[in-house]
């Protein structure tokens, strides 16, 4: 029952608010009034609860990515291996749940390299490399496993440019950039050939913009 997934989504939403409070507590020196404001407004932000129905890994993925940033901050302060390993683990979990979270992994890697300018440490380089590795390798491992189970090389799916093309479509019944099926029919029109679909996507973007 998909409604079970909606209920499960509630837990990471509460977790997101909890991590936000912990971040605030660290940044503002355990300021009680500030903490109360953050807790109050976090739960008052009702749109996050509307995403209960988005059972696509968005909510738990965001929760794990926030935990990754939290333990990154703790690692910068403590230099402990435990905090580094937890940061890496939560990055991997976030990206597995939602591939878009690789953006957060890239941000963590950039923060590590910026930190190197202040603190010369090979552990920071190791952290940056590990974060990027766990963001990329699990996806490749899953694809290899799927290929092995299928007994052949599976199609890589819709090219990402089709989603960009859909985002540039003039909106009708939905808001601009919302899902409207454009990526599906472009892929179908290309007979599910990723290369042909890429060219159709580029042409659609040109038509929409110019």
PLM features: residue spans?
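Hydrophobic alpha-helical membrane-interfacial segments at the cytosolic entry of transmembrane helices
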Residues: 120-145
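Transmembrane-helix motifs of polytopic, lipid-linked glycan transferases
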Residues: 7-29, 67
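Multi-pass, polyprenyl lipid-linked donor-dependent membrane glycosyltransferases
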Residues: 5-12, 40-67, 72, 81, ...
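Membrane-proximal stem/loop segments at transmembrane-domain junctions that anchor or position
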Residues: 144-210
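Membrane-interface alpha helices of multi-pass inner-membrane proteins
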Residues: 83-98, 108-110, 128-137
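Short hydrophobic alpha-helices at membrane interfaces in multi-pass membrane enzymes
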Residues: 33-36, 74-92, 122-126
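Transmembrane-helix signature of polytopic, membrane-embedded enzymes
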Residues: 20-44
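Specific aromatic-rich, kink-prone transmembrane helix
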Residues: 19, 60-77, 87-91, 108
């Amino acid at each position: 029952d998909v409604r079970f997934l909606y209920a499960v989504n509630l837990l990471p939403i509460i977790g997101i608010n909890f991590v936000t409070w912990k971040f605030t507590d660290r940044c503002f020196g355990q300021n009680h009034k500030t903490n109360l404001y953050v807790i109050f407004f976090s739960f008052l932000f009702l749109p996050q609860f509307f995403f209960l129905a988005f059972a696509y890994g968005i909510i738990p993925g965001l929760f794990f990515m926030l935990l990754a940033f939290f333990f990154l901050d703790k690692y910068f302060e403590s230099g402990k291996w435990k905090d580094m390993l937890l940061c890496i683990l939560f990055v991997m979990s976030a990206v597995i749940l939602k591939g878009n979270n690789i953006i957060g992994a890239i941000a963590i890697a950039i923060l590590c390299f910026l930190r190197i300018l202040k603190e010369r440490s090979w552990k920071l380089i190791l952290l940056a490399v590990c974060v990027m590795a766990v963001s990329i390798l699990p996806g490749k491992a899953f694809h290899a496993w799927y290929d092995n189970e299928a007994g052949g090389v599976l199609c890589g799916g819709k090219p990402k440019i089709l989603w960009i093309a859909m985002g540039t479509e003039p909106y009708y019944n939905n808001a601009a950039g919302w899902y409207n099926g454009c990526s599906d029919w472009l892929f179908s029109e290309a007979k599910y050939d990723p290369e042909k679909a890429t060219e159709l996507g580029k042409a659609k973007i040109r038509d929409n913009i110019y």
